[in-house]
Amino acid sequence: MNTQNKVKMHNGRYVAAGLSAILAATLGITTAMATPLDTSWKSATLPQVKALLVKDSGKVSGKMVTYSGKTVHVVAAAVLPGFPFPSFEIHDVKNPTLDIPADATVDVTFINTNKGFGHSFDITKKGPPYAVMPNIKPIVAGTGFSPVPKGGKFGYTDFTWHPTAGTYYYVCQIPGHAATGMFGKIVVK
């Protein structure tokens, strides 16, 4: 396959993902989301978002963020400025692998800074590849669908997870997002 055909195929995936998202939103389809939009989302200004980001308790080494202790705090953001769409960022690393102790309580803060889309930060044992219209089950913890940020503010929410040892994945279940790379791995040991 020549380069031009590869580019057309790649662009076609984004078009299909976008059309799927529009169709799902228009028809009110929620099967792609872990849970429906809820009221636990709070709003934050950019300075407040920056203050939230520094609360992550992990240490970065390459493409891995390692956590230690009985309680860890993971702060993930969707599409921070300077990062490609769609992606998660943790400690300024795109879709890093998270290394978490099995006996830890994991407090997660998820921030949506992407003004054009809602996102989700959901945890599953199902690994990639992911479909354009995902129906990833089971979701063991997560945020569900976020509101689209408006009025110069960003949305964020928190949840707590008590994992057992194993391999998990954090994913965005908005149609097309995980299929085009908005996911990462979690190793709990």
Where are these regions (language model features)?
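Bacterial N-terminal signal peptides
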Residues: G18-G28
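Extracellular/periplasmic metallocenter environments
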Residues: T35-K59, T143-K189
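Metallo-beta-lactamase
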Residues: A51-V60, V65-A77
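Beta-strand cores of secreted/periplasmic/IMS beta-sandwich domains, seen most often
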Residues: V60-Y67, K94-D122, Y156-T164, Y168, ...
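Histidine- and aromatic-enriched segments that form or immediately flank copper-ligand environments
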Residues: F85-P86, G116-G151, A178-G181
